[in-house]
A protein has these predicted regions:
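A short beta-strand motif characteristic of beta-propeller blades
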Residues: 1-5, 37-43, 78-84, 130-136, ...
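Beta-rich, blade/repeat-based domains predominating
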Residues: 4-19, 44-63, 68, 85-102, ...
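Loop/turn-rich, solvent-exposed surfaces of beta-rich toroidal or solenoidal domains
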Residues: 161-162, 166, 182-220
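Short loop/turn segments immediately following beta-strands, especially the blade-tip
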Residues: 166-173, 273-277
Length: 280
């Protein structure tokens, strides 16, 4: 594991597109990228959480507090879809399919503001901008990824310490809810899954307080990479054998205190992993 870039407060939603890395600093208020130049942070008035690239190559972000999907103009995120009439809490991570459907976390409560836990939901934004409730009673929904042939959607339920799977119907609806991986059982009680990324070898999971990046298959732990004192937040691959992982350093403080005082700092680490074809 080696450092790739640094400078962020809390790095979420890393995505690799056309030779460049993109990620959102949800606590630092910036969009970070090395697209068209050196690694830099672009200050934003409204910051996204999850990021994704549409089939036409446009970058979209889940604007966590404004409860909308924004499309990147090069300077700001203009509204792509308004979710404010449907969302019950801040927006979280996001993933899309080849048809232009987006699935996004409706977290249900503002964890960083100290609000009490409430069940969240998954929302589906169709290619025409229509918003649908795809799943109810998802507890602290976080990372999202398609696995296999794209007909299974996996979500990290942070406080339930597990990955939950749904079958994706032809119309985009989510059915057949089931446990994909019980991470507390497979890895340990300290696991709080955040971002995930899917490859042919399984699903990579950033476990935050579990201090590990783990590769799991359905009900199986394949491997786990210890991150020492650092907390892995999210991850993505470049489609080859490189896995990018955002790692938070709380400098010995409890995570909540470090977040509240902005004492946390994030780097991106680069892991060399066996090459596999991505299905995220």
């Amino acid at each position: 594991m080696k450092e790739y870039v640094a400078g962020m407060t809390w790095g979420e939603g890393p995505r690799w597109q056309r030779g460049a890395l993109w990620l959102s600093d949800t606590q630092g208020g910036k969009l970070w990228t090395d697209h068209d130049g050196p690694w830099r942070g672009i200050p934003l008035d409204a910051v996204p959480n999850g990021l994704w690239f549409l089939p036409d190559g446009r970058l979209v972000g889940a604007m966590m507090h404004q409860r909308r999907i924004g499309v990147w103009t090069g300077e700001q995120f203009d509204t792509y879809a308004d979710l404010s009439a449907v969302a019950t809490g801040p927006l979280g991570d996001m993933v899309g399919d080849p048809h232009g459907n987006l699935y996004v976390d409706d977290v249900g409560f503002a964890a960083h503001a100290g609000e009490p836990l409430r069940p969240g939901r998954l929302l589906r934004v169709a290619a025409d901008g229509a918003v649908h409730v795809a799943a109810e009673d998802v507890e602290f929904p976080n990372g999202l990824a398609f696995v296999g042939d794209g007909r299974t959607l996996v979500v990290a339920e942070t406080t339930r310490q597990r990955l939950t799977a749904f079958t994706v119907a032809d119309d985009g609806a989510l059915t057949d809810r089931r446990t994909y991986a019980d991470l507390a059982h497979l890895i340990g009680d300290d696991v709080r899954p955040d971002g995930i990324w899917s490859t042919q070898d399984g699903v990579w999971v950033a476990t935050t307080t579990g201090h590990a990046v783990a590769l799991v298959r359905e009900n199986e732990l394949v491997t786990s990479i210890d991150t020492g004192t650092l907390l892995p937040i999210a991850c993505c691959s470049d489609g080859g054998n490189r896995l990018f992982v955002t790692l938070a350093d709380t400098h010995g403080l409890p995570l909540g205190e470090a977040m509240a005082t902005k004492a946390v700092h994030t780097t991106v680490a680069l892991l060399e992993v066996p090459k596999a074809g991505d299905t995220s």
